[in-house]
Amino acid sequence: MNVITETEYKEENINENTLVNIQEEYKKTKIQEVLNQLDKELIGLTPVKNRIKEIAALLLIDKLRIKLNLPQANPGLHMSFTGSPGTGKTTVATKMADILYLLGYIRKGHLLTVTRDDLVGQYIGHTAPKTKEVLKRAMGGVLFIDEAYYLYKPDNERDYGSEAIEILLQVMENQRNDLVVILAGYKDKMERFYQSNPGLSSRITNHVDFPDYTAEELLEIGIMMLEEQQYQLTEEGKKVLLEYIKRRMTQPHFANARSIRNAIDRARMRQANRIFNSSNRVLTKKDLVTIEAEDILKSSLFMDK
């Protein structure tokens, strides 16, 4: 049996006994570095991380098949990310763009995030130029369309979203070797969107569902957010923040990690106000970096109870 090195992938060197060191090939792609970053940046989401690893493994194997002159399945790369706001969809999309670039499936590796407003015009003849300009900027990378279902408004005959969808469909089919599209949004709304637009559904081969975070995971996220800004939460503060999270999860417009970031920002503001009002004493570094339980307890969520 002969082991093929990187410079020896020539047809005359390949036979059914050719060996490929998959770990060596995997290491050369540097994909593991991206996956490690994903683990570091996102708490939990194990099903999502496993799905991304599966997609990466399939793409790597397809690349090796090409090198060994085996038929390529021509994997569909367009994706659907479904889940509530604040569950890490944009972060994962960024890492997915990195993986696709490292494996050579896209030229540039950039991620362009857009919504309906970036694609759909307000009058006749306005939508096509807007959509085409966005697609031009996205070429060679990944186009991430958040809340994609807002492109389709069947109850409004004068809506131009369908025009944007038609242009998008053409590009997803005809230029799929130079652009990957990720459609994202709430799961139930995305399912209805696909039912109403079977052309889009047929072009999406990778579906990734993002579960909501647990209260404990959101506490970890909150602590991590504070540590990134060089703040510390007291032990009592951690207990209060967990209680805040449990209450906030039952309130309207809860957005997972996004809501926690907002809560952290407000706690920092209350901490600053508390410190300012006690400015008749000399402050220490510990004073400046410590978030106390009272900085969270002053939230209206506790005042109403």
Curated annotation (Swiss-Prot):
Location (main, coarse): plastid
Record Gene3D superfamilies: 1.10.8.60, P-loop containing nucleotide triphosphate hydrolases
GO CC, one annotated term: chloroplast
One Pfam family from the record: AAA_lid_6
Record keyword ATP-binding present: yes
Keyword list, A-Z: ATP-binding, Chloroplast, Nucleotide-binding, Plastid
An annotated Gene Ontology molecular function: ATP hydrolysis activity
Statement: the UniProt record of this protein carries the keyword tRNA processing: no
Locations listed in the record: Plastid, Chloroplast
CDD domains per record: AAA (cd00009)
Ligand binding (ATP): 83-90
NCBIfam families: cbbX_cfxQ
Family the UniProt entry places it in: Belongs to the CbxX/CfxQ family.
Biological function: Necessary for the expression of RuBisCO.
Protein name: Protein CfxQ homolog
Annotated organism of origin: Galdieria sulphuraria
Gene: cfxQ
